[in-house]
Amino acid sequence: MTDRKSTGGALDRRTTLKLGAAGLGAAAFGFPAIVRAQTDAIRIGHLTPMTGFLGALGGYAVLGIKMAEEEINQAGGVMGRPIQVISEDSINPDTAATKAQRMLDRDGAAFLMGEISSASALAISQVAARNKRLFLSIGARSDTLRGKSCNKYMFCVDIPNTVMVNAVGSALLRDNMVKGKRFVTLTADYVFGHDLLRAAKAFFAAHGGNLVGDELVATDVTDFSPYLLKIRQARPDVVCSNLAGNQVTNLIKQYAEFGLPYPIVGFNLNTADAWAAGEGNLSGTWPTVWYHTLDTPGSKAFVEKFVKKNGKPPENHAWIQYISLKLMAEAMNAAKSTDSETLGAYLEKGTQFDILKARKAYFRAWDHQLIQEAYPFTVKPKAQIKDKWDMLQLGAAVPNPDQPLESIYPTREQNPCSL
């Protein structure tokens, strides 16, 4: 396909020669001296946006999963076999579905991983279900994926929208910024944003906040001046962003240029988008699943290796792709299988995985959500910022150490998932 952007895939003559050379080098990593046929590698289909409004996040995703792939192979692979991650640009839901099917049919992928776009993740999950192959949805956050659109073959790693709202909401409640306050929201006009708005409305209603206006924003919008003029007219107490990808970056830059006096917070932010906004532009409280200053031994070691390899700190999508491939390698070794039914049953057992945080994580059997800590963060004063990567101050993990991890996740009563 002419639109294909890939770091693995079709076995043309040049690729075959390269793979043959890689097989010869495998002996140095602990594999038998006899050169293995490429079909003996465990092939994993990996889809993520590498272009478009989520492209910057996808770039970090590829760096993270490739780093994990290298480490796993250097340690002997999985069940004595090398793994090969085939990464491609998902582009949009239709293309993502087509490529997912091709990875299974032509490339011989054992299962599928990846994605950041909730819309594309939904499309891939449908391919996975039809083919009865496991899909590890790594970076998509829509509650819908874990709710009414859940299926037996999809497992979700990233924190869902409800958890992001709860993470930021706990900080807003602490600072008396909800009850009786008037909110205006800007929402990404696709499944993720619509889903996030529902979670935000539920939070406002439960805690006495008043939503006085919302604007749906197309994912290709770059000029936010019409929306900022409406905010100026509405004169809210708080502005809340339900945007995604470079939408957030563009909003933050233009919000600072307009000089609006209303505090801005957000229920979704990825750190690459925060970094791109530039020093002095971002403000308020935002949620994250991980940040490179997290003070745990495992996280610090990962950051050190990533910086040494790439010359910059890892963004949260690099971290989450890295730990996702590591936990799948652990699952395959423990289950002694690459079969999707076997792996799914293993993940449903509640096995705890080290994801480089203070508390270990596990998949919940009834909705396939990885249960883990989340964090709010705020923006450092400009005088305290050391470099462009040092803008954010990570808050305390939620839930508190003495609370169950599931306390910030939707309950069975709140979640319509039926596997």
Q: Could you tell me what each predicted segment is?
A:
Residues 2-7, 11-21, 29-419:
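Extracytosolic ligand-binding ectodomains
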